[in-house]
């Protein structure tokens, strides 16, 4: 266990490793906010967000203004029936109460924004209020990110210190007659321990910076306009408490999150299995990562179990989770409106894919359906040659509406919500098995990423913005193993580029390019720098030759990208040139090709994201982390 160093020179360099427990939570907050470079990071990201305030106003800006008006003007019994605007309230009740809370402040800024009939209202004060509400609520995301990355750092250092102590003890036992050699070895080990500690601390700050500066959040929240950062803050805080062993607090926070935005059901399988195994069944974590889960043998003997199930833990967990859902949904059960609420939250009639196809498996499926129609290509395939396709169906093959009431697949089999659910469950099995088989918190975080990834790949009516649900938690795994650095770099670059169609106005093109290019360079340089430092530390520990050192230094300045991965990333540059310069000039005015830019972007990024998805299976099956 590493205690706080009173030396003022080290206050900004070494984070504090403290004991687990709920009482330490506020102390940990105080500790992470002591470091000057954390404050520099907060100032930097806040400045960027302020500079983005004049950005264009998307339809989501009006969506949230309308929700402010609905929740402030109407009783809760009418929230999910109000339809003056097409942008009806379709988030769970807790988010409605969040909008209600914001409306109390909005009233003093500009009360006109709270009038339901003021559709499209966007006064300067309204714009500033809504923009600042996102920036301020992001504080939870920033704080929770610093807490979790610092705690993971503590786990790694604590584990390494235990290993080094064991090695020192073995050396002392084996070399009792060589006192001078022992002293030299101990001094070298201490120096190497300090080098490793500084390296992990530097990487901890790098990972925090990469997550907090996430370009997806900047584009979606602070330009397009949503509150994803605030919700990600609740998610990370939930993971933080679960990893440190405060199971009930972590489960309550995740239940709260589900009642803010139901899309986080994508992660529910991983949370459910983790809580079931490590809190309700006779199973404990390794790596000393938790304090509340790991009990003494005497405590375990006193626990009341049936068929290996810890009954009291199961009851406590059930009461904690169900009480949150009762608070959220109880009023709607009482008013007999639960069916109306469900119809708003799960509008299956919207179709398989969004108008701009999310870059997933169904994008490729949709594309194949359209390609077969192009110039009657399907007639050359024996299975389809007798199909009769109406002319009006082939009028605009690049339109994005798929699987809705107005347009479905034409040649390939129609996909229903039941089919997407079945495929999703099948592909969830490996990640669930990984959590059940493992004894480490690392598998839990990877399970969250994999569960979200699977729903993103095969879910019904997935939005492209959901890619952020994968990149944010995956960032923390980069602290664990460099293999995740490569995966994160690829997924981050491809996934965040797939968000470009959200910022479609000409004025936003330089902004979106600058954000992604700057971030991609930051990630690449940060990862190769931390990899270089790690290799140098390993070289010192192993006393390798100078030739080996130089070779490893050369290798360290690379993420190990294969030639085809580099070629694919270069293709993104060519695709953006086509989208910005070629399509608007030569193809946009032709109805047949008016949406081809969106189609190509979706399909091209789908290929890369599917590749990253398969990469996660490799990590799971080979246990390479």
Curated annotation (Swiss-Prot):
Its EC number is 2.4.1.265. GO terms for molecular function: dolichyl pyrophosphate Glc1Man9GlcNAc2 alpha-1,3-glucosyltransferase activity. It is a multi-pass membrane protein. It catalyses: an alpha-D-Glc-(1->3)-alpha-D-Man-(1->2)-alpha-D-Man-(1->2)-alpha-D-Man-(1->3)-[alpha-D-Man-(1->2)-alpha-D-Man-(1->3)-[alpha-D-Man-(1->2)-alpha-D-Man-(1->6)]-alpha-D-Man-(1->6)]-beta-D-Man-(1->4)-beta-D-GlcNAc-(1->4)-alpha-D-GlcNAc-diphospho-di-trans,poly-cis-dolichol + a di-trans,poly-cis-dolichyl beta-D-glucosyl phosphate = an alpha-D-Glc-(1->3)-alpha-D-Glc-(1->3)-alpha-D-Man-(1->2)-alpha-D-Man-(1->2)-alpha-D-Man-(1->3)-[alpha-D-Man-(1->2)-alpha-D-Man-(1->3)-[alpha-D-Man-(1->2)-alpha-D-Man-(1->6)]-alpha-D-Man-(1->6)]-beta-D-Man-(1->4)-beta-D-GlcNAc-(1->4)-alpha-D-GlcNAc-diphospho-di-trans,poly-cis-dolichol + a di-trans,poly-cis-dolichyl phosphate + H(+). It holds the Pfam family Alg6_Alg8. Keywords: Endoplasmic reticulum, Glycosyltransferase, Membrane, Transferase, Transmembrane, Transmembrane helix. Residues 163-194 are annotated as: Disordered. InterPro entries: Glyco_trans_ALG6/ALG8 (IPR004856). Pathway: Protein modification; protein glycosylation. It is found in: Endoplasmic reticulum membrane. GO terms for biological process: dolichol-linked oligosaccharide biosynthetic process; protein N-linked glycosylation. GO terms for cellular component: endoplasmic reticulum membrane. Belongs to the ALG6/ALG8 glucosyltransferase family. Dolichyl pyrophosphate Glc1Man9GlcNAc2 alpha-1,3-glucosyltransferase that operates in the biosynthetic pathway of dolichol-linked oligosaccharides, the glycan precursors employed in protein asparagine (N)-glycosylation. The assembly of dolichol-linked oligosaccharides begins on the cytosolic side of the endoplasmic reticulum membrane and finishes in its lumen. The sequential addition of sugars to dolichol pyrophosphate produces dolichol-linked oligosaccharides containing fourteen sugars, including two GlcNAcs, nine mannoses and three glucoses. This is Dolichyl pyrophosphate Glc1Man9GlcNAc2 alpha-1,3-glucosyltransferase. The gene is alg8.
